[in-house]
Amino acid sequence: MTHTTLFTSESVSEGHPDKVADQISDAVLDALIGQDPNCRVACEAVVKSGMVFVAGEITTNAWADVEQITRNTVLQIGYNDPHLGFDGEACAVVTAIGKQSPDIVMGVDGREDQELGAGDQGLMFGYASRETDVFMPAPITYAHRLVRQQALLRKNGRLPWLRPDAKSQVTLRYENGKPVAADCIVLSTQHSPEISQESLREAVIDEIIKPIMPPHWLDKHTRFLVNPTGRFVIGGPVGDCGLTGRKIIVDTYGGMARHGGGCFSGKDPSKVDRSGAYAARYVAKNIVAGGLADRCEIQVSYAIGVAEPTSISVETFGTGKIDEVRIQQLIKEHFDLRPGKIIEELNLLRSIYKATATYGHFGREEPEFTWERTDKAEILREAAGLAAANVTN
């Protein structure tokens, strides 16, 4: 008997106000960590109309021109015209930055690297599955690809009436746990006022959606909802206030896996909200790539100032090829999840973070996304006593 379900995930473009804020926060982090790898950064941004407010706690020997970094980031995104209502050249930039609390420093700094204490308590999840070639859920993967295509066509001038703000939403039909068809695709994009809705709809379907979605998933039952309100001229920080860390499901697995609640952007890797989640993805992906399970979710938790995780747990949703207790043992044998060792293993003390602030932190193939490596898949497979797995990444 066929078991049919629907699952939906969304993504947003680099011009979405929350993503503007994320990119500013990570651009500041990149500027500092490139000079001072041991900097402590917790940088937040708020964007609205003609203003950007950058605040947080930063302890470093480096210097960064936060105002200019902010302006450059906004301009690179595409907010470079006063007629858009938000312009990187003209917007006000206000900063309020203090230092990291000495009470936190006590538990995090001044130790050997491998004994670096977690920057805060918290729980993080990592997930992987065989749904796509990047070991990610299909709905979020294609939602990201749609808004990335929107940005590409905007920037290369093929669709010159596109503007920076956009959102996508992909609903896939699953049969017995496998994606088989696209039920509904939503694409909302900001646009210049002169384009007709008919022309916009036709171009979005033909130039953005169809080149990205697998053609065998599109049939007569697939619904295309393009700018469902009929008009999207006012957008970006003019239409909505943007805030760092407000797109945590877009940043991760599109709702297919659980989330511990902590955001990533603007945080240096001593914050386990970020490094712990990256490590959990690394573990889960290698487990699936190694053939130990077809789906895997890892939870890891920490206490502030303590290096060793307070817990590690495994869920394979009935797809495990060996017992979950054995998988947990293999994790402890082959992955060191202390923050200092995560930072060392994944080479996280580099200016790599602004690239993560758009189109998802996972399922990416760029070399700086070290947590996407599957270099331990074969080791895990052999340790589990399994036949050769089909490792595709």
From Swiss-Prot:
Enzyme Commission number(s) from the entry: 2.5.1.6
UniProt-annotated binding residues for Mg(2+): 18
Alphabetical UniProt keywords: ATP-binding, Cytoplasm, Magnesium, Metal-binding, Nucleotide-binding, One-carbon metabolism, Potassium, Transferase
Chain residues that bind L-methionine: 57, 100, 240, 271
Single Gene Ontology MF annotation: methionine adenosyltransferase activity
Primary location group: cytoplasm
Keyword Magnesium annotated: yes
Localization per Swiss-Prot or TrEMBL: Cytoplasm
GO-annotated cellular components: cytoplasm
Gene3D superfamilies found in the cross-reference section: 3.30.300.10
Biological-process GO terms, alphabetical: one-carbon metabolic process; S-adenosylmethionine biosynthetic process
Record text on cofactor binding: Binds 2 divalent ions per subunit.
Classification via NCBIfam families: metK (TIGR01034)
Similarity-based family: Belongs to the AdoMet synthase family.
Function, as annotated: Catalyzes the formation of S-adenosylmethionine (AdoMet) from methionine and ATP. The overall synthetic reaction is composed of two sequential steps, AdoMet formation and the subsequent tripolyphosphate hydrolysis which occurs prior to release of AdoMet from the enzyme.
Assembly, per entry: Homotetramer; dimer of dimers.
Protein name (database record): S-adenosylmethionine synthase
Source species: Coxiella burnetii (strain CbuK_Q154)
Lineage: Bacteria, Pseudomonadati, Pseudomonadota, Gammaproteobacteria, Legionellales
